[in-house]
Amino acid sequence: MNSFSAERAVSPLDGSELWVVLDPELVPHREASDFLRALHGASRSPHTIRAYAGRVASFLGWCASQGVEWSSVSLASLARFKHFVEATPGRDGRLRSGATVNATLTAVCEFLRFCARTGVIEQAVAGQLSEPRWLRFTPPGFDAGESGQFRRMRARLLKARAETAFPEAFTPDQAGQIMACCQRPRERFMVTLLHDGGLRIGEALGLRRSDLHLLPDSRCVGCTVLGAHVHVRHRANPNGALAKSPFPRTVPASDAVLFSYADYQHERAEILGEDGCDMVFVNLYHEPLGAPMTYRAAKRLFERLARECGFPVRPHMFRHTAATGWVRAGTDLDVVQALLGHVSLASTTVYLHARDADKRRAVEAVAAGRRYR
């Protein structure tokens, strides 16, 4: 296959991370790179942009290897590309899941639609990616409009079969085991913050000290939010961490978060003294000391916890655990939505799934009251 590649670049203006797609001659592919810059300008997550860069590069490479002109690609050719993605093993040697195939096609479709909007390709190329479809049944939280006009959606023709995966959450015993494996105060604070607050790892790594309002009353610093809380804000950070949602939110801080943060602050002061870094999470155990903690460092932490605990430990599982706990405690879905920072309530309803134990109790409760002859 003619190799197109996704490469990381650094903006000479503000030092922010950018992604470009290079052709086999190592020349930036103009349309693909413009698309990625547009995603950056729209404040899309760095992880999303990086993933889209690789998927668009794969599509362009496939087109070049098959003699297909990407700018006038047909629906039949896109179906062939879909089959190629399905049949080609990933880096781990396994075939890609339906969800991964769909994610690849989503990136390609967004790229083609962007090119159509900017006049690079014909509108007909983007128009073939979907078809009119009337939604008879709508998901929870979906606004169909006053006259039902939003029920008429456009369904992608290129879609792989994907199984619905329920969010992975820790049991109370597993959460306790993870905490017991945390060796240092900074580790305990991070795990507690993710577990109790439901923050994404990018949101946690992007926190500034000024975002933590841990007094019962923060009006002295101009904040009217009651009680101890954490502000989650979307902005550029020196460690590349970024909150996914562009909308700011506040998350109440539990007593466990307060106590673990105090322990972490003592540890930080003992190691660094009076450091001037405003980032909450900084390097304490390796050089450069005092520098903002990176995604790579956080990844090493959770990989170590997984090895010691004997089960998968990923940062996002703490978010799933927090959300599942709130829902099962009877918290209204709109409150859970606000805590998680979901734009759509439909994203929150995934936590309404029934456990096997719940289903068994329901069946046995009804069956116990019946009399069979």
Where are these regions (language model features)?
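Conserved tyrosine-mediated DNA breakage-rejoining catalytic core shared by Y-recombinases
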Residues: G202, G206-F259, G276
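Active-site/catalytic core of tyrosine-dependent DNA strand-transfer enzymes
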Residues: S254-G310
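Catalytic-site neighborhood detector that most strongly recognizes the C-terminal catalytic loop/helix
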Residues: L340, S344-A365
